[in-house]
């Protein structure tokens, strides 16, 4: 077991830049889509270039470490006034700022590595890592060949100290690892950092940067090993988890030492090349072309994998296995299932002609417009039937503020429909969102909607409300080893926390 764990040890060299985009995938996608690379998501009021950031990071780390060891550690208290390690007294807000500052320090090096890699590189769509905009190609192209899907909630560490252990093991500086442990043990809210909430995780509003970093690192550790084991799915017939790992190590030795040329091709026949993995908001989905028996083995394996390797207890009933041909898959607010569509193929042999009926699969991706209308009706954009209404609460706002709110609401919906070819639901939602703004502005100026549109200009209003989003694709460096390139196949990283959510999650 120890040798197998050593074999699965991840490459944590600073030269492998591909590790860091995986750790901060949520930040990177939000940065690319919502902010742009010229504006940092970590610093709202400041911009850091490559020349000054390194000096800033070194100063912050030196200052934090020096204060921690020079004045008998930081002192955090829940009362209003607490001893300040910088001298005098400080409020709880100052302590939170120090804690948040440490999270920023941890994030800066990863952000700089991404910028240094993107400089001078052509921005193309990556085939290893996919953004949220590729969810429809994933459903329409990849899941169409799948037969069964398993949906489960991603297991989180029971205590934040367990998540910090993985990050501390990968930290290069021992002082940084000691500072991470110190913050976890000294901060008063450490017992309520991550709280489960409807298959997602709500982080502390005061310190979400640092703990989101720990959570991402924990999930990345799990996914990195999972990608490797996914390629060994042919050995899932083993009953015991320990036996499963031992057989992986055994076959790897044979593949590398004895049958380096032939055994690999033999193993590939028994593997499932159509196993897809998707994670979003603390929930992940496994889609496979295999039978339900294979998915049951994956269910048994995942529970034991979390328990034995990560010391996390997961209940099997939280894993749901569905047949795509019989059940619909609810993911990202969409309903998708594979339906059998009969097709007629006419063939002719010599003089006799006959008909052959072949059953083909067709993936139907539907947007539940009913639930979206229900959410908009609760927000007073329309009634339960979808008829737009004016917003009296916006009457005191300026015209530009009203238009900006409508534009923001449209952008939330457009972000999730931007990659879909079936945009009928999107057009309906845009219609519902536009008219309340027009009605509110017309009522504010005491004129009709038609007169208001004529005064403003339909073209200007249409251009303002329907401005298309710019889809930005990132390209990430690949690993140097051929094996890791193989392990990254068909893994879709879609777990995004900072991009605006759909209206029903507000």
Swiss-Prot record:
Usually encoded in the trnK tRNA gene intron. Probably assists in splicing its own and other chloroplast group II introns. GO terms for cellular component: chloroplast. This is Maturase K. Its main location: plastid. PANTHER family: MATURASE K (PTHR34811:SF1). Belongs to the intron maturase 2 family. MatK subfamily. It is found in: Plastid, Chloroplast. Coiled coil: none annotated. HAMAP family: MatK (MF_01390). One of its GO terms (biological process) is mRNA processing. Keywords: Chloroplast, mRNA processing, Plastid, RNA-binding, tRNA processing. It comes from the Eukaryota. GO terms for molecular function: RNA binding.
């Amino acid at each position: 077991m120890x040798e197998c764990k050593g074999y699965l040890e991840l490459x944590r060299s600073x030269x492998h830049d591909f590790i860091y985009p995986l750790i901060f995938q949520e930040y990177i996608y939000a940065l690319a889509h919502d902010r742009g690379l010229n504006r940092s998501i970590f610093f709202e009021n400041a911009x850091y270039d490559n020349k000054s950031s390194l000096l800033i990071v070194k100063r912050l780390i030196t200052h934090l470490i020096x204060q921690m060891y020079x004045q008998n550690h930081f002192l955090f208290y829940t009362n209003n006034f607490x001893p300040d390690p910088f001298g005098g007294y400080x409020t709880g807000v100052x302590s939170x700022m120090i804690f948040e500052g440490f999270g920023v320090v941890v994030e800066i090096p990863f952000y700089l590595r991404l910028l240094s890699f993107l400089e001078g590189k052509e921005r193309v769509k990556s085939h290893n890592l996919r953004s949220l905009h590729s969810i429809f190609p994933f459903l329409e192209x990849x899941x169409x060949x799948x037969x069964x899907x398993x949906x489960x909630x991603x297991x989180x560490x029971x205590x934040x100290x367990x998540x910090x252990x993985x990050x501390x093991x990968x930290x290069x500086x021992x002082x940084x690892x000691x500072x991470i442990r110190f913050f976890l043990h000294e901060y008063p809210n450490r017992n309520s950092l991550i709280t489960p909430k409807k298959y997602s995780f709500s982080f502390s509003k005061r310190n979400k940067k640092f703990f989101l970093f720990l959570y991402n690192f924990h999930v990345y550790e799990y996914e990195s090993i999972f990608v490797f084991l996914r390629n060994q799915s042919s050995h899932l017939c083993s009953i015991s988890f320990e036996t499963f790992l031992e057989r992986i190590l055994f076959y790897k030795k044979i593949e590398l030492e004895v049958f380096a040329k032939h055994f690999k091709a033999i193993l590939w026949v028994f593997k499932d090349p159509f196993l897809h993995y998707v994670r979003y908001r603390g929930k992940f989905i496994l889609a496979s072309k295999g039978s339900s028996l294979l998915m049951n083995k994956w269910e048994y394996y995942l529970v034991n994998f979390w328990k034995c390797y990560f010391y996390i207890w997961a209940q099997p009933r939280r894993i749901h296995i569905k047949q795509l041909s019989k059940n619909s898959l609810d993911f990202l607010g969409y309903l998708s299932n594979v339906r059998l569509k009969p097709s007629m193929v006419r063939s002719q042999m010599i003089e006799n002609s006959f008909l052959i009926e072949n059953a083909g699969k067709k993936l139907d991706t539907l947007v539940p417009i009913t639930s979206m209308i229900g959410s908009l009706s609760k927000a007073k954009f329309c009634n339960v039937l979808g008829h737009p209404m004016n917003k009296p609460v916006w009457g005191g706002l300026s015209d530009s503020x009203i238009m900006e709110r409508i534009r923001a609401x449209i952008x939330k919906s457009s972000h999730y429909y931007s990659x879909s070819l079936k945009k009928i639901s999107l057009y309906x939602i845009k219609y519902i969102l536009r008219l309340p703004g027009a009605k509110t502005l017309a009522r504010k100026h005491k004129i009709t909607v038609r007169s208001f549109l004529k005064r403003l200009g339909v073209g200007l209003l249409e251009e303002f409300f329907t401005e298309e989003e710019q889809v930005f694709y990132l390209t990430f460096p690949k690993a140097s080893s051929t094996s890791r390139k193989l392990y990254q196949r068909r893994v879709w990283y879609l777990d995004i926390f900072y991009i605006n959510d759909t209206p029903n999650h507000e």
